Regions:
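Short beta-strand/turn micro-motifs composed of small residues
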Residues: 43, 64, 111, 139-143
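Long, largely alpha-helical accessory region at the distal end of helicase-like NTP-driven motors
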Residues: 164-185
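Short, aromatic/basic amphipathic alpha-helical patches
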Residues: 52-55, 150-160
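Conserved helicase ATPase core of P-loop NTP-dependent helicases/translocases
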Residues: 38-99, 118-120
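Conserved interdomain hinge at the start of the Helicase C-terminal
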Residues: 6-55
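A short beta-strand element within the Helicase C-terminal
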Residues: 88-91, 96-113, 118-119, 134-140
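Conserved segment of the helicase C-terminal RecA-like domain
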Residues: 125-156
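Inter-lobe connector of SF1/SF2 helicase motors
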Residues: 1-5
Length: 185
């Protein structure tokens, strides 16, 4: 195996490891349990979206490119239906663009690339402004790794980001926020 092929394989393995890190499942679950609001989660892999949905059963549905059109339609309908118990839709990039649902209050980016456009699109899909609404955009990352570098790169132009390390700190930031939108990292 040439050095270039080995390097490429190592980079893919690093991405997979960071995108699907077990601590991100735990953090997402804790956030969803704590805030108990309609939530969309974004990830980079179908595997993560499906595993997170399993972790959050019966309150979550997946939505991704590997699903049949009817299953996607049902996932959206169940998430939108106020009579449904579904409060979380877990997606792997499929809803990054062109998806609008009123009432989503929290978005959790479990994994992302370094692209600021992706970050902007995900924010727009998840947090629609409405008078009196507080929207919460949370980015999960593994500190001191490439994951953190990707986050910093895609958020270079973000002016209202608050960096915290725990759900407790998110609650404190929310109680002190005078803004109607808080972007928590």
């Amino acid at each position: 195996m040439t050095a270039a092929i080995q390097w490429s394989k190592n980079m893919r393995n690093r991405k997979t490891f960071l995108y699907n890190h077990p601590s991100k499942f735990l953090a997402a679950k804790e956030l969803i349990d704590t805030f108990d609001v309609p939530t969309i989660t974004f990830s980079e892999t179908v595997k993560f979206a499906n595993e997170l949905t399993k972790t959050l059963q019966p309150w979550a549905v997946s939505y991704h490119s590997k699903m049949k059109p009817y299953a996607k339609q049902m996932a959206i309908e169940n998430f939108k239906d106020p009579r449904s118990d579904i409060k979380v839709i877990s997606t792997a990039r499929a809803l990054d663009e062109g998806f609008d649902i009123q009432g989503v209050s929290m978005a959790i980016v479990c994994s992302g690339t370094s692209t600021s456009r992706q970050d902007l699109q995900r924010t727009g899909r998840a947090i629609r402004w409405a008078p009196g609404k507080t929207g919460l955009m949370i980015n999960l990352y593994i500190a001191d790794t490439q994951d953190e570098k990707w986050l910093r790169q895609r958020q270079k132009k973000t002016i209202n980001a608050t960096h915290v390390n725990s759900v407790k700190e998110i609650k404190e930031a929310l109680s002190q926020a005078s803004l109607e939108y808080l972007n928590v990292i």
